[in-house]
Amino acid sequence: MAPSFDFAASILLCAEDNTAILDLGEESEEISWVVGVDASLGDLSMDFPLQSDDCIEALLGREEQQHIPMEGYLQRLLLQPDGLDLVAVRSDAIDWIWKVHELYKFGPLTAVLSVNYLDRFLSVFDLPQEEACMTQLLAVASLSLAAKMEETVVPHPLDLQVCDAKYVFETRTIKRMELAVLNALKWRMQAVTACSFIDYYLHKFNDDDTPSTSALSRSVDLILSTCKVAEFLVFRPSEIAASVALVALEEHETSMFERVATCYKNLKKERVLRCYEMIQDKIIMRNIMRQSAGSVFSIPKSPIGVLDAAACISQQSEDTFVGSPATNYESSASSKRRRICR
């Protein structure tokens, strides 16, 4: 069982200098793995830097040691302690992140990092169940930190709290939560994610040719979608990236992958193929839903629709990937009625 939240809560109560909270200036800004991003999820157009073989091998060694949730995190989510559906709680938090991400047209890596921070924190600390607002506070802090890492223009913390947010937190409270996250993650914020590997595998599985824009767009869609489905937490970022590349390229032959996999002992072919099959299973599930539902409701044919449909089945809820910007702006009009949390 993870440690209690007492340590993080004590940080929330202490006073700190606002300039110490990840105040990144031009001289200290880290280079993003994703460059040239058109942040609209509906029309992704981006270039990922192609990593060298040596760089990929180094990333494979780093990802498990520093940048993924603690072992046993998924099992703890599925146990539902005291009847609390932690998978649904996590999904709700990610739903909200997706809505704000779309509203502000953040880049895809901002969304991926937000979920990475949220999961890594939850794998270390148990949030108090009696404080429903704590999960939302964590979601706000995770998104704020990710935006500071990746975006050139970062909204004020108060401006992030839109899109049907149930609580509104003061800026100082958000900054204290950010500090709690930073300490829990040991300030390792430039996380190794599936985005770190995707361009490399797209090239390798495409005979070292530059992948098409549609293949890259599908890959990003799938990476974003796998973030929400809790079952994919059992896989490492490199395994998800390799599987996503195979699906995006509609690659059914594994001979090329076998040649690549033999180069890196840290990349296990069996796990990649298992992840690949899980994604394909979600596609089959989507098709069954479309056939059985008929005209009652339709599920998008995109990868996002595929995995969101799977999440919908597993949670018995109609989850969506992103919220409508129009709805998001309308929801801000009622913000005065929401509780302000100090």
From Swiss-Prot:
SMART domains: CYCLIN (SM00385), Cyclin_C (SM01332)
Cited InterPro entries: Cyclin, Cyclin-like_dom, Cyclin-like_sf, Cyclin_C-dom, Cyclin_N, Cyclins_cyclin-box
Domain of life: Eukaryota
Region (Disordered): 322-342
GO CC term (a single one): nucleus
The keyword Cell division appears for this protein: yes
GO molecular function (one): cyclin-dependent protein serine/threonine kinase regulator activity
Region forming the signal peptide: none
UniProt cross-references to SUPFAM superfamilies, sorted A to Z: Cyclin-like (SSF47954)
Keywords attached to this entry: Cell cycle, Cell division, Cyclin
Disulfide-linked positions: none
Cited Pfam families: Cyclin_C, Cyclin_N
PROSITE patterns registered for this protein in UniProt: CYCLINS
One GO term (biological process): cell division
Biased composition (Polar residues): 322-334
Family membership noted in the UniProt record: Belongs to the cyclin family. Cyclin D subfamily.
Protein name: Cyclin-D3-1
Gene that encodes it: CYCD3-1
